[in-house]
Amino acid sequence: MKEEEKNLYLYYLKKMGNFSNKPLSQRIVARELFEKFDVFFFDAFGTLYNRGGFVYPGAKAFIQKLRETGKEIRLITNAAHDEQELSEDLLKMGFLIYPHEIYSSGNFLKELVQKYSIQSAYFLGRESGKILLERSGVLIEENPQKPVVIICSTEFDSLRLRRAEEILRQSGSLLIVLNPDACAPEIDGSRSDVSGLQAYRLMNETHCAVECNGKPFPEVFERALKSVPAKSRVVMVGDTLGTDIVGASKVGISSCLVMGRNMREESFKDDCQVLGFTPDYIISGFE
């Protein structure tokens, strides 16, 4: 991880109360997970699929095998999308994951809206994210009633970013982060900065208050856990140490890192040392 990325995830850890875990990671092949767990929590982007409908080798067959063997599946994603829309997009890629099995970081916006009595906000993100604000009763405005900015992606230009900075420099400002991820993997193996890092920069530049939804924070995991049978053996499978693995550890479930996507082999040991976390299991993919 690059330095700014590490600092962001350390900031998240501080917000959650600074805890750590250091189990000995076991390198296994994906099929070995079948016998170990009853419930599978999956990250979405970078774990099962990537941009343009690209599906990682073996991912569809792995999900299908889970269905055939009666395993429970949940999608725990920081993609702040409507669950029905995301389910339909997944089906187009060959994944049968029902809307009620999807737990998105965007699900928690309504609670923050009520907590802070938000009626309107300035929005940074793609068009598909606007439905979450509408569903939560938030009007999208250039001059919101209160200095509130909601960010869920980095698909905006420099003019919109400057306007967000202006709003967040006002007294009593609040930045709501619907996707806390720092970086996302590309198909070619490179990585791109995403909304978590942009939000972190805004916070440091404007000294605004910040609320984050989604992984690694425990609420999204806890809500998903309530939907599965008690005493189930649960594993979180994802590609990101600072969100998927840390979040799983926070709520006491096992974790499995998909190596080589958002986590490079060459930096793995150092990154684990910095954050104080290692996954229970490591796989190189689903084949």
Predicted regions: what is each one?
Residues 79-83:
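Canonical radical SAM enzyme core domain
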Residues 106:
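Class I S-adenosyl-L-methionine
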